[in-house]
Each structure stands twice: as structure tokens, then as C-alpha cells.
């Protein structure tokens, strides 16, 4: 169970409306009076796991998180509502740049293999990586919109810093997406060249 420090007191983060998580397909927040509600769709960094989902409810007195998949492994602290949600979102993306750098290294290895004409299964590798990159690109776009709304709700300049971090992550995924397209085209060119060579060989044999 995770706990939150809020207004100097340790508070239990309760599970709320767990069934509604099944309907989460994107990230968004909504504020009505002093009550903030949010739902979040988080792509997985692991091949063996699907996307993860959680929801929050936050007001001047309570900070409630529905997190049945245990996304948050650490305490979430804050002396006011905006600090709670700000720290929560920073936890969400704290390892993302390192994850994206590892994706780039994988793409570079694929490029090296393509250049040296060694290895196989390029198409499936590139396809899986493009799916991952696309999922994170969409996620960051949604999170940027969420942070812009939070900045409007709470008028806290710390959200501007968080938005800049998300924009940098989004820019990286855009670059990786373009890189993966180039690798796919390189692979397709090699496939077509091999097919042409085979056809030329068959033509010579049959004449």
C-alpha cells in the first residue's frame, strides 16, 4: 500500500472506483468546483506487460488514487493539492528519458545490422519498436494537454517546468519515429534488391 504526505500528515491512498479503469483509453483531468478527477493510460516499458491504468481524485483535504496495478512504488508527498499531483506526474516520467535512450540504442543496432547485412527478422523488430514509439508519442501529447489544464486549474508555475520535460520527451519520440521509418525503408530497399537479384538469376537459369 502506498501512502501520501499531505498537509504534514501521513494519509492512506485509498482505492476508488476500480471498475471504471476498464474504460480508460487516454489521459485526462477534469475539475469541478474544488474537486479534481483524472484518469491515466500509461504505456508499458516491458514487452511482457500491456498498458497500465490508474485514476485520481483530489481536493483540499483528500488525495485518492485508484492504482490496482501498483504503478507507484514510492511515497507521494505534497503540502497542497497541486504539489501532490505534480509529484505524482514527475514520478510517472522520471525514468522515461533513459527508456527512450535505450530504444534509440536498439534502433542503432538494427541499423548496424542492416548496413552489414547480418541478422534477420528486421521487419518484425522494426514493427514492434514503431508500435512502442507510437504509444509513447501519443501518451506524451496527452500528458502535455493534462499539464496545461493543471497549470490553468492551479496557476502553479511548476507545471510549466513539467510541461517542458514532457515536450522534450515528445520531441525524442518524434525523432525516434522518423528514425524507425528510415530503417523500415532501408530494410524494404534491401528486400527489393534481393528479390531483383533472385529474379535475374532465375531469368539467366531459364534462358
Q: Residues of each region from the PLM?
A:
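Generic structural signal for short, flexible, solvent-exposed coil/loop and linker residues
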Residues: 18, 25-27, 77-82, 88, ...
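Helix-boundary and N-terminal cytosolic regulatory elements
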Residues: 1-83, 106, 142-160
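Cytosolic regulatory modules rich in charged/polar residues
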Residues: 83, 87-97, 101, 105-127, ...
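A short, ordered amphipathic alpha-helix with a cationic face
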Residues: 75, 99-101, 136
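A generic short alpha-helical patch detector that favors 3-5-residue windows
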Residues: 77-80, 102, 172-175
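Short charge-dense sequence patches
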Residues: 47-63, 77-96, 118-134
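Membrane-associated alpha-helical segments
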Residues: 120-207
Amino acid at each position: 500500500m502506498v501512502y501520501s504526505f499531505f498537509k504534514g500528515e501521513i494519509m492512506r491512498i485509498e482505492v476508488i472506483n476500480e471498475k471504471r479503469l476498464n474504460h480508460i483509453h487516454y489521459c485526462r483531468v477534469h475539475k469541478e468546483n474544488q474537486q479534481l478527477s483524472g484518469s491515466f493510460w500509461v504505456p508499458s516499458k516491458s514487452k511482457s506487460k500491456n498498458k497500465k491504468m490508474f485514476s485520481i481524485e483530489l481536493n483540499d483535504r483528500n488525495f485518492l488514487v485508484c492504482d490496482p496495478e501498483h504503478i507507484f512504488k514510492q511515497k507521494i508527498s505534497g503540502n497542497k493539492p497541486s504539489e501532490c499531483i505534480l509529484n505524482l506526474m514527475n514520478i510517472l516520467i522520471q525514468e522515461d528519458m533513459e527508456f527512450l535512450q535505450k530504444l534509440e540504442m536498439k534502433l542503432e543496432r538494427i541499423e548496424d545490422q542492416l548496413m552489414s547485412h547480418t541478422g534477420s527478422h528486421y521487419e518484425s523488430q522494426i514493427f514492434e519498436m514503431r508500435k512502442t514509439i507510437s504509444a509513447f508519442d501519443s501518451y506524451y501529447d496527452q500528458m502535455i494537454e493534462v499539464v496545461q489544464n493543471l497549470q490553468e486549474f492551479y496557476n502553479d508555475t511548476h507545471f510549466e517546468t513539467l510541461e517542458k520535460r514532457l515536450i522534450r520527451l515528445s520531441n525524442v519520440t518524434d525523432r525516434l519515429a522518423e528514425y524507425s521509418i528510415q530503417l523500415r525503408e532501408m530494410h524494404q530497399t534491401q528486400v527489393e534488391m534481393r528479390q531483383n537479384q533472385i529474379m535475374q538469376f532465375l531469368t539467366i537459369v531459364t534462358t
